[in-house]
Amino acid sequence: MTGLAARASSARPVVPLDLPENGFDLIGEVKLASPADGQLVTVDDPGRRVQELALLYEDADVAVISVLTEPSRFLGNLDHLEATAVAVEVPVMRKDFLVDPIQVIEARAAGASGVLLIARLTEASLLAEMTDTAIGFGMFVLVEIFDQTDLDRISVVFDREILIGVNTRDLTTLKVQPGRLADLAPHLPDHLPGVAESGVKSPDDAEAAARLGYRLALVGTALVTSEAPGETTRRLIAAGRRAISKRSAS
């Protein structure tokens, strides 16, 4: 633990998450596989492909790059995170099934500027501890929820500067339930940016999320499997920002 904490403290500096007050941005996700869709990328050098995707996302002006580090279902690892953090200048977030503050410190040691924490994986007290661990290193935290019960549970961290992600994928069936974004949007704290997760595949999806008040969308499969990931990223961001402009003008 002492050595890991020392590595985290001496790692590449955290890249601050800088979001405009009333805008729409994308978290571009790098992953090689998913439980819902199987293997997404077949290449001889997965690490290199991870870096290539990250650079395309960065060039398309994403706010954050999310990197899967879970090995069995997503074919990820911490090396992918570290390689991405070295290659880009935007914040990089570790996405995994994190259940211990040590894993947050691991992420920082590998160069992450943020972490995703799944609300229902831990008790509220542990979620708060992991959140505070990340914030203590200057990292941002995206707390992921699936329903109102999850939202109630994470009220212990509403006084921290976190992002709240609403995942529309049903964990049992793995099917996307887009209506969940609309159901939960009115209940999200006004002072915390909301993130639409899973199911944002088209400009129409991005526009719909933005109209509901979500400040970001986390998009993975639609970008990874696109023939032109950078251009797809740009279209999604532009659609969300158009929706914001229309809402502001009305």
PLM ranges: what are they?
Residues 112, 211-214:
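As written
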Residues 103-122, 127, 133:
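A short alpha/beta connector and helix-capping loop motif
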Residues 107, 164, 220:
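Residue-level signal for inorganic ion chemistry
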Residues 1-92, 99-102, 133-163, 171-178, ...:
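Conserved N-terminal beta1-alpha1 strand-loop-helix module at the mouth
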Residues 198-200, 210, 219:
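C-terminal active-site rim and adjoining tail of enzyme catalytic domains
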